[in-house]
Regions:
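Flexible "cap/lid" loop of the alpha/beta hydrolase fold
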Residues: 1-34
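A structural signal for isolated positions on well-ordered beta-strands in alpha/beta enzyme cores
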Residues: 3-5, 108, 136
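Membrane-interacting alpha-helical segments
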Residues: 9, 104-107, 164
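Generic structural signal for helix capping and beta-alpha/helix-loop junctions
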Residues: 13, 117, 144-145
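Low-complexity, flexible helical/coil segments
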Residues: 18, 38-47, 142-152
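Alpha/beta-hydrolase
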Residues: 22-29, 33-126, 130-134
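Catalytic active-site module of serine/aspartate enzymes centered on a nucleophile-bearing elbow/loop
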Residues: 122-165
């Protein structure tokens, strides 16, 4: 890997204590909801916590959300059952941050222009402050890759070219 672009990485360490507790509860609730009610209900709760209203997303001309493929649904299952629970129990410590710092020249931190300071946005800016890195803005919000695919790809090329990639 030459460069990693981390778009709104979810690292609870960079939330204030009250937000961390709320985020941990939302993770637990989304996980339990998934087991009882399935994907749609769980992701609705998760999205709402992160300021995403799927019924009110803005799209670039011609863009729309596509139905999820079987592979994407399997990825969502893994995300909800394995990754989400780890958010509230596994956090970077100083030694983990040191590992990231050692490779920070290969890291681009990014947020969406429409993220409106949601918790992922705050996590990203907290990580950037700890690492001494800038935050690049990309079109759209947390799901900007899907709502603004052309503009997002254009911005990604700009960011990578500016880094000589």
């Amino acid at each position: 890997m030459d460069t990693l672009v981390a778009h709104e990485p979810s690292e609870f360490l960079f939330l204030i204590e009250e937000e961390r507790a709320e985020a941990g509860q939302v993770v637990l609730t989304a996980y339990e909801t998934y087991k009882k009610e399935g994907f749609g209900a769980a992701m609705s709760r998760w999205a709402a916590f992160n300021g995403i209203d799927y019924g009110n997303l803005e799209f670039e001309p011609g863009a729309q959300l596509s139905p999820m493929t079987d592979e994407q649904l399997a990825n969502i299952d893994f995300f909800i059952t394995h990754e989400m629970p780890a958010y509230s129990t596994v956090q970077l410590d100083e030694s983990g941050l040191d590992v990231v710092r050692a490779e920070k020249g290969r890291l681009v931190l990014a947020t969406g222009t429409a993220s409106e300071r949601n918790w992922s946005y705050r996590c990203t800016h907290g990580l950037a402050a700890r690492l001494g890195l800038p935050v690049e803005e990309f079109p759209g919000g947390h799901v900007g890759l899907k709502t603004h695919p052309t503009a997002f790809a254009t911005r990604l090329r700009e960011v990578l070219r500016a880094r000589g990639r």
